[in-house]
């Protein structure tokens, strides 16, 4: 779960750690649906009680198409086009009994239970879901933590996710959170996630507080056995309840992600782990060899064995398990520089020796390669060299925890931590609830020491049901304009063709004739009630290809009456 860091840091600087709770209404969260925001069209299935602009109400199972066209939104429904301007709101109402009450988007199965606010941004449809906090969590908790997790772990996740959402409420913006890992993953409601729904229901409104403000309830998939400080991840000031501490539960969980590699102590071929790591290690050895008078050429020395191997130098102070290096103590086979002892010569002649012609550079001479008696120590950077060479990186972040253990004939290297490591570990919470029989309150107390739990009012009644009188009242008709005389159809039907009349619209309304058999296709003409047309072809999709006396196009079959 990544965070909007600039905003967090700015608020911390401005107000200190204890941020004031500024929102008075905790019942609604506004979610920018980024999964659907890069489209000029959004398909909406109505599976509940919804209305638009106090004009339209929809039967359960209705399909709408809302399209951005020339800076405006147009809603297509039952062959009708409604020009909504720059915004359209699908407003949810109370529905009878326990029937589902929400929307399905772009043909998906999950339910989006809220008011859908649609506007135009850069020519695209921008969807923002205004959803009750507890309903919002039904689309978050089972996607941040699997529905199969123990119920107390799911409850802890529900409290953390609720607290995160409430802390981010910001009436000055047009949305509070996005639906991806920049905030929290939100995917809508799947009725099969019964455990997550139970966890949300049994912790309704429970939120984490510290010094009178909503706490920073960060959470991570796995911390690798040690919680991380947000200062080490994002900078800023320390947070009293988010510190570095050992987490035995995360590391005990067999489902915590671990990547491993084996490095032989006495490689027969001089390879340390693999060829890539060997090249890195040998390159780091070259300066030492040259200083001690050994041939530094890579081809002339080899690694006989690894005497010791361990992680070294904490990256964030002595308590941190995130290390900078893997320190290796190595036995080498190398060539020592050859030295020659020359005795001085005395000439019996008094005449000076002739001047020697200048010679080129003298190439060093080397003894035969032999084992070096003194071990060499080299520090190999974990990030990126070791994790890349051994292919043990988990999430491409330079915050993973590397451990080295002695396995007899080899050293075993393991890498752990999936995510930023701050706050609640989902794998740790799973282990605590599953193997240690703890409550969600105890889980939260372990990961957020000093945080208090408080129950907030996070529910509001839905708008009253749409009245039966409103359901029976047709929407407003367009302002009457002089109706043109219908153009008579002079052409007679041929083989496989029929005469039809436009009957499925109001007497003073029109039916759109489209260029293609699609609700978003261009409108090429408007047909009036009672107008006679020639049906040329019946399509499987429910469309008809028709012809007037002047043009051909497509209409939905249910709006015409075919005369055979």
Give a label for each model feature:
Residues 2-510, 524-541, 551-555, 561-564:
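Conserved, single-site charged/polar hotspot
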